[in-house]
Amino acid sequence: METAVNAKSPRNEKVLNCLYQNPDAVFKLICFPWAGGGSIHFAKWGQKINDSLEVHAVRLAGRETRLGEPFANDIYQIADEIVTALLPIIQDKAFAFFGHSFGSYIALITALLLKEKYKMEPLHIFVSGASAPHSTSRPQVPDLNELTEEQVRHHLLDFGGTPKHLIEDQDVLRMFIPLLKADAGVVKKFIFDKPSKALLSLDITGFLGSEDTIKDIEGWQDLTSGKFDVHMLPGDHFYLMKPDNENFIKNYIAKCLELSSLT
């Protein structure tokens, strides 16, 4: 096994954003962002969450404090970097993954890489707003490089999740578009075949907005020999922005992990 880097290394802190450290936490919850997203939204979860959890939000290259870095070329490059950053903080504590949309796929590939290289698995993976990676119903990602700025604006308004005042601010939109294009390119290249057997042994939970157009979240069950369940919450693709839904997710995750630790 490769030697883990120091838990306080700049590399680790660059990739993982932990705004609210909790040394007494029993579990570490690693959160993965949606396409075009940063780490701040999920890092803030750590302020109001069960005391048994410490939240670390993944910060991808090309945004926030990593603004000057080039974007990743594919999802495996992203996962490899995350695994390197994770190793120092998951050696002594149980951990789980939560990903929304694009982040669900990053969480999956990160889990598979951890298992392949280090024989480690999260206790649980929580996926949100994402079709199974091998599903024929997985939405086709538009080639954003072929869209005008105005077309991207309309696409974001239709999709939801990005505040309208930000989308209508031309300067903000021009900063955001490169992030979205980079992540959309990664998703577009991500091809995942249906496995002939379970790849993981952990439990998977799916969350979905009642008005989301995402289909076949149930297909995630094909990836694990563990249990699988789905929870539908009111809202669209970004249903988790609603405080009630966010609280439900955080409380559910805490209960799941506490029960997992007893088995």
Swiss-Prot record:
Query: What EC number(s) are associated with this protein in UniProt?
Result: 3.1.2.14
Biological process GO terms, please? lipid biosynthetic process; medium-chain fatty acid biosynthetic process
Consequence the record notes for mutating S101C: Decreased thioesterase activity
Isomerase in keyword set: no
One GO cellular component term of this record is: cytosol
**Record PTM N-acetylmethionine, positions in chain:** M1
Lipid metabolism among keywords: yes
Q: Which family does it belong to?
A: Belongs to the thioesterase family.
Q: How does it assemble?
A: Interacts (via C-terminus) with FASN.
What does it do? Contributes to the release of free fatty acids from fatty acid synthase (FASN). Has broad substrate specificity, giving rise to a range of free fatty acids with chain lengths between 10 and 16 carbon atoms (C10 - C16).
Protein name, per record: S-acyl fatty acid synthase thioesterase, medium chain
Organism this protein belongs to:
Rattus norvegicus
